[in-house]
Amino acid sequence: NKSADEFIVNSKTNGQLKVNVSGDLLLLDFPKDTLRNNSMHKEILEVLGVLPIELYEGRDDILAILDNEALVKTLKPDFSLLKNINKRGLIVSAEGSDCDFVSRCFFPSTGVDEDPVTGSAHTTLTPYWSNKLGKKKLHAKQLSERGGVLYCEEKNSRVIIGGKAVKYMQGNIYL
């Protein structure tokens, strides 16, 4: 029973995504998101109860940058107000104390108030923090209740996102 070092996942929104196995990490290869300034400061202040220091809009989500990790960790967003924002969700981030950056991701319009670890959000976060910190390889933490650690790398028009995974199912498909 040989394990594959590389395989392809077909995604409805991102096309074919290449997955590489490197040691105990799974590395996913995503298209990089492009950020534009967003002017919804008042609406995001109402949702979060804190004013972001920077606010952007990506392909699917709004990215709010906060002053520090403690603010990100202690947020209690108003999910009913967040549902009214015309995007999939809200990514909140700050520079990390023991990593490059931290984040939390809220998607109540999809039925998920807070996603525990969000690979797709890091296609938005990685270009922002890579530019801000002046480095291509980044170490990130998502501060949801379950939490997670991600390894991110900006590579031209792509973002490589890696993390550890636990096998929860095994089987065979017969065609």
Regions found by a protein language model. Give the residues of each.
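Active-site proximal loop and beta-alpha junction motif in alpha/beta enzyme cores
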Residues: N1-L175
